[in-house]
Amino acid sequence: MEKRKYINNIYIYLVMIFYNMNFASITYSSFIMRDFSKISWIIPILTLIPIFILILLYKTKNKVEYLQNIILFKILLLINSIIHNTVLIYVSSQMMGISFYQLTPVSIFALVSIVLTCFLSFLDINKLLRLALILITGLIWFVPFIFDFEYNNNLNMELFGKIDFKIIKGLYYTTICNDLFLYTLYNKEYKYPITKKALLIVSSIIMIIASLQIIDSFTLVNYRYYEELTMPSLNRYFSHQGKRFFEHFDILLLFLTMTTTFYKVPFNAILVKNTLNKKYQTKFLLLYFFFLTPLVFFLILNYNYLRLFLILLSITTFLLTIIIIIYSRKGENNVSTVNPTN
């Protein structure tokens, strides 16, 4: 039964690992390589300590219906979701415009992203997770195709020359590991719920891979190389094969960003939608994206406010994670009192 449980949930775990590891660890590793350089390889492993503590305190068997009755949880979830999606759509649209279509207004890419993600938000979570797995498969096929092109062995080609560091920072803030807890809020919709053991394994993989990426990058150049960069080109596994280099690392980063946007924006919206009565869910999604649109355009026109959005995202993410952990324990006790068979 235990093996069957993990086999049936394999697509969920693959999506969790990919969107929290292969993407977040790239940006996370870049920060610590630039700021800590010499000792940066050990920091992701040390980060596992607070993550493990939070997971061990968390009760994965809680009933999400209990959380949905907590007004503070619903408010924080809504605020966090809106800020998260605003930043993610803004970042992906900026990267599309900066990297490839400089003459096309960024607002066009933002509007297209909003329309597509709004449409995807009407899917149920299992269909969305399977779509995310298809996007991952597409990326796996995309990388070998790029490596068919040969370029000179030149490290300068790998730098993020035009993409502002604040935009890259937005990637990290929108891929932090509170998602691991948010996945469990969909437990009633999975065939088998996500277990605490699975969360521990996934978080370990995320941070171990981040450490390995840093160690491998230091075999390519000296750590002082990264101290001089605004945003170091990091993932050698993607950008380097023997004597060949992938010239435009931003193409791969853009693909990661866009696939993450088309998955995570609906993921966040569906989670908020599920806290409401079914007869209000369709209207809510339309109002949600109607309200989201001016926020994205505001950020496009007022670039300096990105820092404020990232600070608010960090605060709401932290508070939301703490509330989920606290009320998961109360929720379990509450449910066991009402229905001892669960």
Predicted regions mapped to residue ranges:
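Membrane-interface capping segments at transmembrane-helix boundaries
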Residues: 3-4, 59-64, 325-339
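Hydrophobic, membrane-embedded alpha-helices of multi-pass small-molecule transporters
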Residues: 7-27, 43-54, 77-81, 85, ...
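Membrane helical hairpin/interfacial module
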Residues: 22-107, 112-116, 292, 317-320
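Membrane-water interface regions at transmembrane-helix termini and the short interhelical loops
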Residues: 34, 62-63, 91-97, 113-134, ...
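Hydrophobic alpha-helical segments and their helix-loop junctions in multi-pass secondary transporters
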Residues: 82-93, 137-161, 217-218, 321-333
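Membrane-interface loop-to-helix entry segments
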Residues: 87, 107, 120-150, 309-321
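Membrane-interface interhelical connector segments
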Residues: 219-248
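Extracellular/periplasmic helix-loop-helix junctions in multi-pass membrane proteins
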Residues: 280-285, 294-315
